[in-house]
Amino acid sequence: MTKRIRAIADNNPMAQLLMTIPGIGYIIAMYIVAEIENISRFPSYRRMGSYAGLIPSLRASGCKERRGKITKQGSSYLRTALIEAAQVIPRMKKSKLSVFFRKRIVRAGYQSAIVATAHKLLQYAYYVLKNQMPYSEEYPVSA
């Protein structure tokens, strides 16, 4: 089965672009391709994050706004695949994503840092697919 998935991923240009992102292999790339279908469905990476359920919930009262846990609305398959891909990032040595993870873990703890890294992976996936260019450490994604 994995040989067939790998063969499909090798012939899919979207999967090839996604596999240039650290932490995303051919299985995760095919999950993303299957769930997203067409990148033009999403006008921004925030909409794509909302689709995956990786955005924080907002609670507002008066003038105060608080961000809570992720909403978990949207595609649970995509969210799970990205969180699995993010599990690899802490083991990387000198990657922009691993630096991002290490900064987050100090502030928020391990699991929250993994979810934030999964969201960052989704942002990179959006830019890679939208621009049709391989991943580069210089992508302008905010923290």
Question: What is the role of each PLM region?
Answer:
Residues 1-143:
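A detector of single, family-specific signature residues
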